[in-house]
């Protein structure tokens, strides 16, 4: 029998203990705050580890790291980025293409804790009503951004990019940008379940495409143990990616959809240990 959304993870907590039912969540938060700390260590303490923001930065003033979407906008607008920016984009593209799926979204993005909080509150207070918008709208928005950059000759997304805006706000203070971040929080809380990360964000859409054939993946390796409690579906920001691996015995046990954020919450909340985080070659996934 399916559990209520507000009770998602309770069985796992009782059966596996706190650490094993929150392990991947804790590790993700540590990773997110570690990356954020590398950005903040310079302006706050004078120790520059990551110099810049989430769109473009230098690691130890040496290794460039550039958001691929910003680079694509620059190319589309007719402006060839500097060699250091192109190098940074290649590094990030190769890194996430090899690692897999949307690891940036769940392990690095500073907005993820905010949207996670909104959706935890949604479950906690039984806010089950949700507007319906197509998940592919993020890919449409991605194309619109690139076409818009080509037509205007500007990096149009960077004017409102909430990911880089969040990083800048933490360094320079929350001004009007706080209103956009608050709007995203309320959108996820009151309008569309997993609305930003699961439906709209073009940054996540691009990382999903880049990492679609990467190494790291989630697999329902012991799906025969599934008791249909639905806790994994309740907490997953992209629950449609779990249907085939969990419910269709003819499908590969691996989550092969590029929409998967590899956040590990399905692993945490499953009281039967159906899921593992593994490599794409270990369970016979379709390529």
UniProtKB/Swiss-Prot annotation:
Molecular functions per Gene Ontology = 4 iron, 4 sulfur cluster binding; metal ion binding
Query: Which branch of life, at top level?
Result: Bacteria
The gene name on file is napH
Topology class, membrane: Multi-pass membrane protein
Give the taxonomic lineage as stored in the record.
Answer: Bacteria, Pseudomonadati, Pseudomonadota, Gammaproteobacteria, Enterobacterales
Q: Which UniProt keywords apply?
A: 4Fe-4S, Cell inner membrane, Cell membrane, Electron transport, Iron, Iron-sulfur, Membrane, Metal-binding, Repeat, Transmembrane, Transmembrane helix, Transport
Q: Where are the transmembrane segments?
A: 30-50, 80-100, 140-160, 171-191
Q: Which cofactors must be present for this protein to function?
A: [4Fe-4S] cluster
The identity of this protein, by name, is Ferredoxin-type protein NapH
| Primary role | Required for electron transfer from ubiquinol, via NapC, to the periplasmic nitrate reductase NapAB complex.
């Amino acid at each position: 029998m399916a559990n209520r959304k507000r009770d998602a993870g309770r069985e796992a907590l009782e059966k596996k203990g706190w650490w094993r039912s929150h392990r991947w969540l804790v590790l993700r938060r540590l990773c997110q705050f570690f990356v954020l700390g590398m950005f903040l260590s310079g302006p706050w303490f004078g120790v520059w580890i990551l110099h810049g923001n989430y769109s473009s930065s230098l690691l130890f003033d040496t290794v460039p790291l550039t958001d691929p979407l910003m680079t694509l906008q620059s190319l589309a607008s007719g402006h060839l980025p500097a060699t250091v920016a192109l190098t940074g984009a290649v590094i990030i593209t190769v890194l996430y293409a090899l690692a897999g799926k949307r690891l940036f979204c769940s392990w690095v993005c500073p907005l993820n804790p905010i949207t996670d909080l909104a959706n935890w509150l949604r479950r906690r207070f039984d806010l089950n009503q949700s507007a319906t918008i197509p998940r592919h709208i993020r890919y449409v928005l991605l194309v619109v951004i690139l076409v818009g950059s080509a037509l205007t000759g500007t990096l149009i997304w960077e004017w409102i990019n909430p990911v880089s805006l969040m990083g800048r706000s933490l360094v320079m203070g929350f001004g009007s940008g706080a209103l956009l971040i608050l709007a995203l929080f309320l959108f996820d809380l009151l309008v569309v379940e997993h609305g930003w990360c699961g439906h709209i964000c073009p940054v996540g859409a691009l990382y999903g495409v880049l990492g679609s054939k990467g190494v790291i993946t989630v697999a329902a390796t012991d799906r025969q143990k599934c008791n249909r409690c639905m806790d994994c579906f309740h907490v997953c920001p992209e629950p449609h990616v779990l249907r085939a691996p969990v419910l269709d015995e003819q499908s590969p046990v691996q989550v092969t959809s590029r929409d998967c954020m590899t956040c590990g919450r399905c692993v945490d909340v499953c009281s039967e240990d159906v899921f593992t985080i593994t490599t794409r070659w270990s369970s016979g996934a379709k390529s």
